[in-house]
Amino acid sequence: MYYIGIDLGTSAVKLLLMDETGSIANIVSREYPIAFPHPGWSEQDPADWWAAVCDGIPALLDGFDASQVKGIGAGGQMHGLVVLDKNDAVIRPCILWNDGRTQRQVDYLNGVIGKDKLSRYTANIAFAGFTAPKLLWMRENEPDNFARIEKIMLPKDYINYKLTGVHCTDYSDASGMLLLDVEHKCWSKEMLDICGVQESQLPKLFESWQPVGTLTAEAAQMLGLPADVVVCAGAGDNAAAAVGCGAVGGGKCNISLGTSGTVFITSDTFGVDKQNALHSFAHADGGYHLMGCILSAASCNKWWSEEVLHTTDYAAEQTPITADKLGANDVYFLPYLMGERSPHNDPASRGAFVGLRMDTPRAALTQAVLEGVAFAIRDCVEIARAQDVKIKASTLCGGGAKSPLWREILANVLGIPLTPPQTEQGPGYGGAMLAAVACGAYPSVQACAEALVHAKSTTQPDAALVEKYNARYAVWHKLYPALKVSFAEMEALQ
């Protein structure tokens, strides 16, 4: 038996074929474009996602018996606004998670409606990437399009709709819309009223592992699959990645070094960050989690290496950063290339190198980029620690986690052991696991994780190096407050 996992990312979809033992039989990826129609805007055509899935799944199954595929589960980029009309046609391009156009709407929600009310309604405050501010923006700036909305969806839910014909979402992904009462797992009437939408315009809610339907005849024919393949609700990318790393059940932590970076802390019970810096979301295992999200993580290293240094050989750039250089770098980097969410909630914040001298070598800047991302992740960890959340160790995933140097830097910046899973496929693997649960192969997500997820070698922190990084983090931590006003002034000049 096989299960297909779909990782609907920002730049590509990654498709994964998993057998009943948890082994990955095949992986295929298909890229699609991102449009930046105005500074700070970020959009995609949902048709490109579906075309990539339709092209990729037959390639994924090449050489395999498609009749043995039993289920499909998707993990997808969160927060994106997909709107359909009465004919289920896409009304406008999807406004993505990293789109920054909604600051005025965020200010209205947090300032006029008020953070206390938002937290009471949804367990969260407004952030520029969330879905509700995008609905307000659309109502104000595209009223004709807004009036045509029949269904509001998230990116991976659009794929599930194309697979099954069912308008659905799951609790983990819906948590990031600012429309869900996270504690009670239902749509918030207050938030729907604020945004001017009806509950009938929203998809049906499911737990991540629950089946939402089987393939339509059209989808089955296009993909070369049996029509009785079960499709589960799936999860937001971070929740799916946590499942794929084994971070299920209470008291676990998973850190992701993907395009964005996350600190994902699981809990069996509902809880809210009193500082409103961490998100309080539902988890794909039926529980809850606190999550800090930095908008630029591995993407910072990609930008630095490819756009500035004009190289894709990341390992070669990191080779000069020897052990004696760790904890001794006098160059600091703020990784706010797309603004920042946790903990600053500041779309105007920007990237910066601080501490350059005439004798600063190229490798010191590369090291500063890796350390700056690690320090930003520590910002999120420190907020959790301030609320007596004990983080003694963490699993680790994402493209950046493949770098031994970055793992070592992060382990020492955080002062905790970091362990990537043997299968480093994040949301796609988690999606396939959820599909296996939906098909009855395992009684629960936790049972599936215990059976399939196995640890790789652990990167341990070094006490002396932890002390050095503590001192440098204290310096780095003061840089954003010192530059905040300047960032706002730069934004005003645009």
What do the predicted segments below correspond to?
Residues 26-30, 203, 457:
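Structural signal for short hydrophobic segments within the conserved structured cores
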Residues 92-106, 421-422:
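Short, acidic/small-residue loops that bind anionic groups at enzyme active sites
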Residues 1-92, 120, 148, 220-221, ...:
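N-terminal glycine/serine-rich phosphate-binding loop of ATP-dependent small-molecule kinases
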Residues 22, 45, 72, 99, ...:
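Residue-level signal for inorganic ion chemistry
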Residues 58-97, 125-131, 160-181, 204-207, ...:
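Short beta-strand-loop/turn "lid" adjacent to the catalytic site in phosphate-handling enzymes
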Residues 4-5, 103, 110-127, 133-168, ...:
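Active-site core segments that coordinate phosphate-bearing ligands/cofactors
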Residues 15, 81-84, 93, 265-266, ...:
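Short glycine-/acidic-enriched loop or helix-start segments at secondary-structure transitions
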